C-alpha cells in the first residue's frame, strides 16, 4: 500500500515484483556509476590546465569506449530478459479469473465456477467508512487464495483500459476484442490496490482495482457464500 510522501515502490507482494525491485536497484546502481564517471571526466577536463594538442587519435581509447558500453548494456539486458520471461510464464494456474473493463468499472468472472461473477464499482467518497481509502475502495473485491498461481484474462467491453496492481508487479492492457492474460502468485495475505492505467474517458480516475489475498480455506468459504447468493 502506498503512503504519503513515498519515494520508492510499494512493498512487493509477489515473486515477480521482488525480482523487479532487485532489477531496479541493479540498474539504478549502474546508472549512478556511469553518471559519476561522466561528471568526474567533465570536471577534470574543465579544471585541468594541462593540454596535449598532438593527440589526434588513440586506438586504445576507442577500443575502451566501444567495449565498455557494450558490457554495460549486456549487464542490464540479461536480468531484464530473465524477468520478461518470468512475467510471461504461466504454468498450471490453480484459478482463472476473467477481468473485463467497462466505462467506468471492472467486472470479474471466476471461470472455474459455474456462476461466480460480479461487477466492481468504486465506493463514493460520502459512503466510505473510517479506515477506507478515497478513490481506491470498491463494493466488491477480487478475492483470491494466497500462495497459489492465479491467471487473469483481461479484456474490455468498450475502450482501452489497463488492469494494474503495483504491489503484484502486474499491468495488463484491456483491449476490446482481444483477450490478454497475466499471472501472479501472492506471497502473503492482504489487500492490494490498483487503478485503471489507461486513459479511458471522463471517469478514468474512478475505476479502482482491489485484490484481497486470503488463505485457501477462507477463499473456499467466500466462494461458497457467493455461489449461494447468486
UniProtKB/Swiss-Prot annotation:
Binding residues for Cu cation A1: 161, 196, 200, 207
Chain ranges on the Mitochondrial matrix side, renumbered to this chain: 46-59
Keywords linked to the UniProt accession: Copper, Electron transport, Magnesium, Membrane, Metal-binding, Mitochondrion, Mitochondrion inner membrane, Respiratory chain, Translocase, Transmembrane, Transmembrane helix, Transport
Residues that coordinate or bind Cu cation A2: 196, 198, 200, 204
Protein's UniProt keywords contain Protein biosynthesis: no
InterPro entries: CcO_II, CcO_II-like_C, CcO_II_C, Copper_CuA, Cupredoxin, Cyt_c_oxidase_su2, Cyt_c_oxidase_su2_TM_dom, Cyt_c_oxidase_su2_TM_sf
A GO CC term assigned to this protein in UniProt: mitochondrial inner membrane
Annotated EC: 7.1.1.9
A GO biological process held by the record: ATP synthesis coupled electron transport
Principal cellular location given in the protein's record: mitochondrion
Subcellular location, record wording: Mitochondrion inner membrane
Matching NCBIfam families: CoxB (TIGR02866)
Subunit record text: Component of the cytochrome c oxidase (complex IV, CIV), a multisubunit enzyme composed of 14 subunits. The complex is composed of a catalytic core of 3 subunits MT-CO1, MT-CO2 and MT-CO3, encoded in the mitochondrial DNA, and 11 supernumerary subunits COX4I, COX5A, COX5B, COX6A, COX6B, COX6C, COX7A, COX7B, COX7C, COX8 and NDUFA4, which are encoded in the nuclear genome.
Chain's role: Component of the cytochrome c oxidase, the last enzyme in the mitochondrial electron transport chain which drives oxidative phosphorylation. The respiratory chain contains 3 multisubunit complexes succinate dehydrogenase (complex II, CII), ubiquinol-cytochrome c oxidoreductase (cytochrome b-c1 complex, complex III, CIII) and cytochrome c oxidase (complex IV, CIV), that cooperate to transfer electrons derived from NADH and succinate to molecular oxygen, creating an electrochemical gradient over the inner membrane that drives transmembrane transport and the ATP synthase.
The name this protein goes by in its record: Cytochrome c oxidase subunit 2
Name of the gene encoding the protein in the UniProt record: MT-CO2
